[in-house]
Structures are given as structure tokens and as C-alpha cells.
Amino acid sequence: MANTELNIEASAFSDGFLYLFNRSNNVIVKFDYQDFLSYLKTGNLPKIEISRISLPEIEKFEAGFSGATFKEKSQIIFTASVEATDDAYNDGEIIGSLIGVINISDFQKPKVIRYNLIPNNGENPIKVESVTILSSKSNDNTEVVFITDDDNGNTKLIKANLKM
């Protein structure tokens, strides 16, 4: 990850592996979970696998990872936000957010299966910071909660149903 700013925005766990999501350059870092825990105690860096995902642009700014959770063993539901800035740390004008699904069955070639913009409901653009699954009612219907941040200290929890 040379020449990449480090800004871990999300983590997810599945099948003995920890996945960290870097907002800058939309990189996913994969560790064996037990090796990662050992690293925290010993400082011995474990084997790292890295993949980069291309996410859509809104108004010429690429979306950046903001949240992630596993739906199934190889499917990650992710959120990404778009701000008018090229800086991985400092906030810019909020342009919008999206939700999507990534298939990581081949971690070296992960694929964004689908994504949708998250509607603003006539308000200012929403910046979604994370997502978690409340329940899976069926294979096609998943209830989630988003947490938003307007960069002014205000947050909201928003429940939504995703048709997968």
C-alpha cells in the first residue's frame, strides 16, 4: 500500500479472517484473525492480502468505504460516502452515499455485484458511516441499520430493507 493514506473506516469478520476497509484508494486488507491477534501481542506482522475495489464516482469524486458487514461467507454489504475532497482524513462537502454488495469468493479479484445510491429524502445529502444487519427475512430481503454523520456532530440511525 505504498503511497496510500491509511484511514481504516470499517472492519468485518468471516470464516476466521479479519477484513479492514481503507477509505483511501478503497483497499481491503485481509488477515487471518488469530495471526492478527498474535501481532497485537508480539508485533510480528502476519501475512497480509490486499485487494483494491473501484467504486463509482459522484460529481467526479470516487466513493470511499465507510462501513462493511458480511451477508454471507463471500458477500459483503458495504457503504461508501462521497465528499468533495481528495483528502482521506479531512471532511469535504457531503455529496452522497451508496450501499452495495461485493463478492470476495476470489479475494484477488473481488467484484462489486451491485450498488445503489442512498436517497436523501429531500434533505441535504446523507453521509452514511456504517451498516449492520438486523435480520435476514429471506435470501432476498435483509433488514439493515445505517448510521449517518453530518460532520456537525449530528447522527441518525436509519432502518432500511434491502432487496438482494
Where are these regions (language model features)?
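Sequence/structural signature of beta-propeller domains
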Residues: M1-M164
